[in-house]
């Protein structure tokens, strides 16, 4: 067994997703840790952004029993004229018990986020050990930004390695270098998001500049040349769906052999969760024209001199 301290470390998990084949090699279990330093306008997991557990209201499941109102000690829930409910998010966000959700018999009120120990998380992950062994898969830490919570992410990676579970991480890169450096020896694979090369445009889209992100990526590629890094970009309409971005990223990645690249087309999955959290989806009804992500992929690959499967 690993250290007692590592096994008992705790953090807030909002989902454990099994049988994933898109977030690292093989069949994987993804552990989603809550909390992120970025505020991406297109985020498909808005419940991942705040670090604390949150209550969400799904009016489609509400049966109008009002047990949630009776259970709430903060008078945070009111009934609208159409029978739906409104939540005072200022009161909900400081609530420690979320009694409204526990009282709901229909899952109209649900909780995003649950405190779990490393032992509890890995007990769930290990259930699919046979699939990992046969496919070369393992556990992927995601978020949010998993390394924002080093007090749970690092013990989880160490203990997974101790239990011979292959590990990967999805990161936005906006974390202290020392944290990423400490995590790297316990990782088999890194999925590293680069959303924009221009810092001001980056700030407009996600709330912070990109200097730390690009610095961390360069250090990771340089100091850990045997660690495979897959850079990924969600291609967002009006944000990074242009050739200028693609050429700049290709130049940045030129010369590194331990890095792959994937351009991911924009999608609208997860927009309903904004309603559940009483938030507006900032992207509206925009869509990405067919072929744009493929064009970005081609430009990045050609600029950095990568050999794609099509060229072979």
Curated annotation (Swiss-Prot):
Keywords, sorted A to Z: 4Fe-4S, Iron, Iron-sulfur, Metal-binding, Oxidoreductase, Repeat, S-adenosyl-L-methionine
GO biological process: alkanesulfonate catabolic process
Catalyzed reactions per annotation: glycyl-[protein] + reduced [flavodoxin] + S-adenosyl-L-methionine = glycin-2-yl radical-[protein] + semiquinone [flavodoxin] + 5'-deoxyadenosine + L-methionine + H(+)
Repeat found in the keyword field: yes
Broadest EC class assigned to this enzyme: oxidoreductase
Cofactor: [4Fe-4S] cluster
Triggers of expression: Highly up-regulated in the presence of taurine or isethionate.
All copies of domain Radical SAM core, residue ranges: 22-309
Binding site for [4Fe-4S] cluster 3: 72, 92, 95, 100
Domain 4Fe-4S ferredoxin-type: 53-82, 83-115
Biochemical pathway: Organosulfur degradation; alkanesulfonate degradation
Residues reported to bind [4Fe-4S] cluster 1: 36, 40, 43
Binding site for [4Fe-4S] cluster 2: 62, 65, 68, 104
GO MF term list: 4 iron, 4 sulfur cluster binding; metal ion binding; oxidoreductase activity
Domain of life the protein comes from: Bacteria
Residues at which S-adenosyl-L-methionine binds: 42-44, 144, 193-195, 267
Record family assignment: Belongs to the organic radical-activating enzymes family.
Additional free-text comment from the UniProt record: Taurine is an abundant dietary and host-derived molecule whose metabolism to hydrogen sulfide (H2S) by members of the human gut microbiota has many prominent connections to host health and disease. The human gut bacterium and opportunistic pathogen Bilophila wadsworthia produces H2S when respiring sulfite (HSO3-) released from organosulfonate substrates such as taurine and isethionate.
Summary of subunit composition and partner proteins: Monomer.
Protein function: Involved in an anaerobic respiration pathway that converts the sulfonate taurine (2-aminoethanesulfonate) to ammonia, acetate and sulfide. Catalyzes activation of the isethionate sulfite-lyase IslA under anaerobic conditions by generation of an organic free radical on a glycine residue, via a homolytic cleavage of S-adenosyl-L-methionine (SAM).
Listed name of the protein: Isethionate sulfite-lyase activating enzyme
Organism this protein belongs to: Bilophila wadsworthia (strain 3_1_6)
């Amino acid at each position: 067994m690993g250290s007692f301290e590592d096994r008992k470390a705790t953090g807030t998990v909002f989902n454990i997703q099994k049988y994933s084949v898109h977030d690292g090699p093989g069949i994987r279990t993804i552990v989603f840790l809550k909390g992120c330093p970025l505020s991406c306008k297109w985020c498909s997991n808005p419940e991942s952004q705040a670090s604390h557990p949150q209550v969400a209201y799904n009016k489609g499941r509400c049966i109008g029993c009002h047990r949630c109102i009776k259970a709430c000690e903060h008078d945070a829930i009111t009934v609208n004229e159409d029978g739906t409910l409104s939540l005072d998010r200022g009161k909900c966000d400081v609530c420690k018990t979320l009694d409204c959700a526990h009282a709901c018999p229909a899952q109209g009120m649900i909780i995003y986020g649950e405190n779990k120990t490393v032992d509890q998380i890995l007990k769930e992950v290990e259930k699919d050990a046979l699939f990992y062994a046969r496919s070369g898969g393992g556990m992927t830490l995601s978020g949010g930004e998993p390394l924002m919570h080093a007090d749970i992410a690092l013990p989880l990676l160490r203990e997974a390695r101790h239990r011979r579970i292959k590990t990967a991480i999805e990161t936005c890169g906006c974390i202290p270098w020392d944290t990423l450096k400490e995590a790297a020896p316990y990782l088999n694979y890194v999925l590293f998001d680069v959303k924009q090369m221009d810092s001001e445009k980056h700030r407009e889209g996600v709330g912070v500049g990109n200097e730390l992100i690009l610095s961390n990526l360069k250090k990771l590629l340089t100091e850990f040349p045997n660690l495979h890094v897959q850079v990924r970009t969600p291609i967002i309409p009006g944000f990074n769906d242009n050739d200028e971005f693609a050429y700049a990223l290709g130049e940045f990645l030129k010369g590194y052999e331990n890095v792959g690249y994937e351009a991911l087309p924009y999608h609208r999955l997860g927009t309903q969760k904004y309603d559940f959290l009483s938030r507006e989806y900032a992207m509206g009804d925009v869509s990405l024209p067919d072929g744009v992500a493929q064009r970005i992929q081609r430009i990045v690959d050609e600029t950095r001199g990568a050999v794609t499967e099509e060229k072979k």
